[in-house]
Amino acid sequence: MFLTIKRAVCIRATLIFFSAAYVAATVPAASQESDAVVVKMTAERMFVPEKVSIKVGQTVEWANDDTTMTHEVTTDPNIASDPSDVSIPEGAQPFDSHLIPSGKTFRHQFTVPGLYRYACPPHENDGMLGGVTVAK
């Protein structure tokens, strides 16, 4: 019986050790992912939240939570239905996600401060517009 208790204690200690090691190994990766500001794209054809504020170097992640439609994020006036719906600050390059399937995401890191106005071209006429303000 003593050997059985000793074995149980050893197994429990081993499980605790490996559980702690697993958590320690995965926390930095989770922290890096959580640095992104998340904007959801909904079935109501909205960006939620519609406007976000971040600092230079931060990332915005657009997540398509809509189970029925693809969505897109663009600041490119050549892609937007109405070029006046999108804008970027001087020195920035336009970006476009292409169509984002349901359950997928698109990430963009902002390196130039200013106001970025973006649209979802397939639903732009429905008012699916948003903005990112990037501070120094």
Regions found by a protein language model. Give the residues of each.
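Extracytoplasmic copper-binding redox domains, predominantly the cupredoxin/blue-copper superfamily
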Residues: 2, 27-136
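Bacterial N-terminal signal peptides that target proteins for export
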Residues: 2-15
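Prokaryotic Sec-type signal peptides and long signal-anchor helices
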Residues: 6, 21-22, 114
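Generic low-complexity, intrinsically disordered sequence content enriched
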Residues: 7, 19, 83-84
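Bacterial N-terminal signal peptides
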Residues: 12-24
